[in-house]
């Protein structure tokens, strides 16, 4: 689990596009805290502080504390919007979380020991099907990432979610199947399949 942190915020009295633009001009980000059967709370945060946390990594999997005018609220980031042109943070949504509460989180997947995979050594390719896995997990036990060990994997092998070690008490949101996280594909096979498709398409055009 990533190390928690605290952000200072102030309550927003006004909402709407005009108010949000004014906040951004003053170096602040509009945000909302919702959940826990309480009314949504509109707040403003330092653009610099939030941007630093986002770029540091683990932002969406780290429980934080927001000090709103002296009142500390425990939250988990659920969404944020970036300006498509200038790439700065436009808005953030936070979910209130209590101690031990269950949350649904998209957790990044990391792959290790590629050099110990016979399939990759033979020229195979790591085909990543899921870069993230959505988990139901305690807010106090959210992993920063899930680790997939590629040791011993050969061409044609598949890594299913059942092969991935999850934190205690965590379960995948998808429960109706043992879904694929990654496979070791053969490059030669991929080339042959591409050539076959090209030949078929060429034959159809001639016909």
From Swiss-Prot:
Coiled coil: none annotated. The keyword Endoplasmic reticulum does not apply. One of its GO terms (molecular function) is 5S rRNA binding. Keywords: Ribonucleoprotein, Ribosomal protein, RNA-binding, rRNA-binding. Gene3D superfamilies: Ribosomal protein L25, beta domain, Ribosomal Protein L25, Chain P. Disulfide bonds: none annotated. The keyword Ligase does not apply. One of its GO terms (biological process) is translation. Residues 1-21 are annotated as: Disordered. Part of the 50S ribosomal subunit; part of the 5S rRNA/L5/L18/L25 subcomplex. Contacts the 5S rRNA. Binds to the 5S rRNA independently of L5 and L18. Belongs to the bacterial ribosomal protein bL25 family. CTC subfamily. This is one of the proteins that binds to the 5S RNA in the ribosome where it forms part of the central protuberance. PANTHER family: RIBOSOMAL PROTEIN L25/GLN-TRNA SYNTHETASE, ANTI-CODON-BINDING DOMAIN-CONTAINING PROTEIN (PTHR33284), RIBOSOMAL PROTEIN L25_GLN-TRNA SYNTHETASE, ANTI-CODON-BINDING DOMAIN-CONTAINING PROTEIN (PTHR33284:SF1). This is Large ribosomal subunit protein bL25. It comes from Sinorhizobium medicae (strain WSM419).
């Amino acid at each position: 689990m990533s190390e928690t942190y605290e952000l200072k915020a102030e309550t927003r009295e006004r909402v709407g596009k005009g108010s949000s633009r004014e906040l951004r001009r003053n170096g602040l980000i509009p945000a909302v805290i919702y959940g826990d059967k309480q009314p949504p709370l509109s707040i403003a945060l330092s653009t610099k502080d939030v941007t630093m946390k986002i770029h540091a990594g683990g932002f969406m999997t780290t429980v934080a504390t927001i000090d709103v005018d002296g009142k500390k609220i425990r939250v988990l980031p659920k969404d944020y919007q970036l300006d498509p042109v200038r790439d700065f943070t436009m808005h953030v949504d936070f979910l209130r979380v209590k101690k031990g509460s269950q949350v649904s989180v998209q957790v990044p997947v990391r792959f290790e020991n590629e050099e110990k995979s016979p399939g990759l050594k033979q020229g195979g390719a790591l085909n990543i099907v899921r870069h993230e896995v959505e988990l139901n997990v305690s807010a106090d036990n959210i992993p920063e990432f899930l680790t997939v060990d590629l040791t011993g994997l050969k061409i044609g092998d598949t890594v299913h979610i059942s092969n991935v070690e999850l934190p205690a008490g965590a379960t995948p949101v998808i429960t109706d199947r043992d879904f694929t996280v990654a496979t070791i594909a053969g490059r030669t096979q991929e080339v042959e399949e591409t050539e076959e498709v090209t030949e078929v398409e060429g034959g159809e055009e001639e016909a």
